[in-house]
């Protein structure tokens, strides 16, 4: 079982990762609407990467009794 402070910090980081993912998704949508498909694609990839980070930390918490 994780220390409560460590668990709290990991949860805060998960929230930051998901916030970043939504922000990058918003950027992707904007750039796509402007016809800048390269930028849109890059931000979509970044959004997925941030979601992946959040899921790794979530699985870590689940595997450690949280």
Provide a role label for each language-model segment.
Residues 1-66:
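Iron-associated oxidoreductase/ferritin-like identity signal
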């Amino acid at each position: 079982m994780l220390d409560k402070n460590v668990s709290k910090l990991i949860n805060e980081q998960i929230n930051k990762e998901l916030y970043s993912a939504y922000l990058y998704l918003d950027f992707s949508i904007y750039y796509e609407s402007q016809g800048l498909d390269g930028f849109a694609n890059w931000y979509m990839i970044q959004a997925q990467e941030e979601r992946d980070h959040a899921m790794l930390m979530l699985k870590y918490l689940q595997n450690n009794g949280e």
